[in-house]
């Protein structure tokens, strides 16, 4: 699943090609995504100029003067910038054709993503309005985590992946941040001290910044806007490395299910 670094990589790749461009045509080949593509999407977008491309959590926001298109990649989605003459392939569901001969193509093999439209403030949309702070913002720090963790019995990894606590920290990056902070994923969130949460918040910021700098992580489907895979996979310390040596102490990495998701950690380094 594309996580925050992959979505931010896409935003940075797409923005120079679409900002300031007018939408000439919208082609919907298959509207059957997680939520159906609105039937009036073409009417809403055609003739509009894309004023800005923003990211909120794992959502991309394409702002125009009259409304905002909201894109989520689900499990396997991606956006590509292509010449308008490039023929669509299987799973290429929507094209947004621009006035310079380019198009923005939404591909989603598993169809768990979405492309929606709102004329209101997108931050008030039901999918966005209850989200927690951005992890790379000043609003996210150890104090924020410690305050919300009081009385929580959930594992700290599950707590960290809760979008109401902080957005965009998916499974890959939660595992990596906990390893950097030397915290065991199954420790109860309510028993983590403020000092340890300070370390964890800083580790989250560092992991996400490193991943963005490397274009995200490609495990299966993710490609950036120019068709390139992400390279952060080469830097993974624990994720998907069960039985391999911890980069810090050489102890074999362990794996288990924590909160219905896969967890990877070093039993010696992380406590």
For each predicted feature, which ranges?
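A cross-family signal for N-terminal binding/gating loops and helix N-caps
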Residues: 1-113, 261-265, 270-271
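Generic detection of long, well-ordered alpha-helical segments
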Residues: 1-4, 135, 139, 193-201
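Glycine-centered secondary-structure boundary/capping sites
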Residues: 20, 47, 130-133, 182
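Basic, nucleic-acid-binding surfaces and adjacent catalytic neighborhoods in DNA/RNA-processing proteins
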Residues: 22-40, 54, 146-271
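Short, glycine- and charge-enriched coil/turn segments that flank and shape catalytic ligand pockets
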Residues: 38-44, 48, 65-66, 83-89, ...
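Phosphate/anion-contacting hairpin/loop surfaces
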Residues: 69-168, 173-180, 188
């Amino acid at each position: 699943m594309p996580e925050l670094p992959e979505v931010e990589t896409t935003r940075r790749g797409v923005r120079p090609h679409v900002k300031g461009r007018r939408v000439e045509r919208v082609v919907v080949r298959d509207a059957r995504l997680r939520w159906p593509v609105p039937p009036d999407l073409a009417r809403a977008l055609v003739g509009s100029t894309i004023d800005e491309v923003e990211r909120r959590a794992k959502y991309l926001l394409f702002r125009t003067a009259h409304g905002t298109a909201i894109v989520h990649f689900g499990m396997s989605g991606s956006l590509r910038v292509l010449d308008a003459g490039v023929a669509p392939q299987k799973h290429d569901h929507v094209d947004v054709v621009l006035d310079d001969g380019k198009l923005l193509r939404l591909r989603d093999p598993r169809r768990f993503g979405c492309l929606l439209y709102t004329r209101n403030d997108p931050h008030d949309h039901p999918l966005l309005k209850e989200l927690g702070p951005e992890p790379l913002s000043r609003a996210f720090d150890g104090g924020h985590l410690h305050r919300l963790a009081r009385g929580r019995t959930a594992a700290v990894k599950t707590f960290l992946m809760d979008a109401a606590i902080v957005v965009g920290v998916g499974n890959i990056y939660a595992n990596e941040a906990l390893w950097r902070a030397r915290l065991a994923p199954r420790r109860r969130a309510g028993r983590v001290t403020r000092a340890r949460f300070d370390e964890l918040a800083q580790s989250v910021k560092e992991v996400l910044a490193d991943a963005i700098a490397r274009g995200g992580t490609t495990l299966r489907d993710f490609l950036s806007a120019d068709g390139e895979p992400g390279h952060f996979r080469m830097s993974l310390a624990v994720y998907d490395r069960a039985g391999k040596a911890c980069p810090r102490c050489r102890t074999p990495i362990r794996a288990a299910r924590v909160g219905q998701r896969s967890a990877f950690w070093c039993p010696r380094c992380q406590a």
